[in-house]
């Protein structure tokens, strides 16, 4: 689909369809009022008749409105004007795109980007409209023998902005939105892949493919033999029960003209399937453990978006691929592992495996002398209990970095919330036999997991994002969400000095 931005009056638009908002109860938006005036009250007369109340998501398609050059006008219910928020705005955009496709529109000029959304500017509204549109059109049906027919005639969508001086901001928003949407799609596709296809070797193949597609990207794959030489015993232990080889994919993007500029490092947990190992998970819902690699998938999607945007920064993405299976060679509760850092860990539960993979990955990235390191992982069920399915958790050893990430989450509407990491929580990780245990009990489970990782991130500024509650959805809408790609790309946009606010 082609996106563009323009600034013009609705009555002068020669398009297949004009999209304008109507507020509850039956109140025309300023743009709809202009059309109503041109049509001698035609639209307001329909509202008085009760054809549209203006409730969120209501749609009314009008044909041949008097005085209007466009063939059709789509009236979109936007709810109460003062209550139009971010979530409702994005839902309205998606419903609008769905209606345009269902009604056969090939092109449309959308004036919904002129609506007032609390605390948001033109850049945000246009970018979110692009992201919401692409996300709403996403499907994953490549494994269906008969592909469902979908009617999608819409080929061109123009977003109108109030003034000509906002055109450049709107164009930038489209560029950013398309790159982010591409990264989100890549992340969702990886997450939704079945685990008999998407194993660690598949992650590595996708990393290589990214390097083939973009000159600014190079890839290195580290297999078990090299991990053995590096002393990544903890990482290797997790994958011992699986016949699929553990592989760590290093994706390097160089965009900074200063070759000595320190890189930002993103590390993604890539458990392509997590059975729990010897500490086997319950059978119900275990199929969703294919999503335990969504941290790696989001890092991959972020690297793809970054390459598309060609930002002037250096970033390294690490996909820590592994599979946790029970087997005669699997690691056990009671085992003591010597990590790459030299610290020892007593395994109390083999289903707390993500941190055992990440700890060695965090030690490995020390060699890059990073500006900062951000790891992303579906790490703890405790985070779902703490924050639900709407907000990701952030823990960090560096206040400015934590602030940057939370700020980026607010800017992108891919929300995160910082959790504490006080010294007292480290007490729960004590072991009588090793330097630490791999779990600290049920209380504060997300925090103690963060405390565990922090022991391997002492040589750089570090943050951890727990996406256990936000990486995928269950039920009828089951599937990967692609989060937190939007947040991570916003963080990188900010780091590269890109202005994304008026």
Curated annotation (Swiss-Prot):
Entry keyword set: Aminopeptidase, Cytoplasm, Hydrolase, Manganese, Metal-binding, Protease
Active site feature: 281, 355
**Of which family is this protein a member?**
Belongs to the peptidase M17 family.
What are the GO BP annotations of this UniProt entry? proteolysis
Q: What is this protein called?
A: Probable cytosol aminopeptidase
Q: Which GO terms describe its cellular component?
A: cytoplasm
Q: Which gene encodes it?
A: pepA
Note on cofactor: Binds 2 manganese ions per subunit.
PROSITE patterns in the record: CYTOSOL_AP (PS00631)
Functional note = Presumably involved in the processing and regular turnover of intracellular proteins. Catalyzes the removal of unsubstituted N-terminal amino acids from various peptides.
The primary site where this protein sits is cytoplasm
